[in-house]
Amino acid sequence: MSAGADAGTIAAIPVESDDGHRFELLAHIPPAARRSLLWLPALGVAARHYLPLARALAGHGVAVFLHEWRGHGSSQLRAGRDCDWGYRELLTLDIPASQAAVASAAPGLARIGGGHSLGGQLAACRLGLDHGAFGA
């Protein structure tokens, strides 16, 4: 999907958490990016719903990476009696896997984190666990 010559394109980056959970990180990287943002969605909202935000920020030089929660969108998992998870998996496995993918896809860019609703809360919780989680 193209967002225009100046804004870059959308790419799906495969990510695997340390426990084997696989999902895709949606990336919108403009040609002259100055910083990167790992965006954590609200509870129950698939990453793709934030593509308009990613396009707008890319137009201002921000490489945007949209995290996908377990059980939504590109995640291989779906909650059920035999498959559940909690904040521990999100904060210590999935978000760090996305952070590593961002660092690999956008080396040298200043890194920031943010989110919508529960995503913002979990971004703050991640910083509580690792004060350098979103640092350059």
At which residue positions do the language-model features occur?
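N-terminal cap/lid segment of alpha/beta-hydrolase-fold proteins
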Residues: 1-29
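Alpha/beta-hydrolase fold nucleophile elbow
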Residues: 106-117
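Conserved alpha/beta-hydrolase
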Residues: 47-49, 54-80
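Active-site glycine-rich loops that stabilize anionic/oxyanionic intermediates
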Residues: 34, 42-45
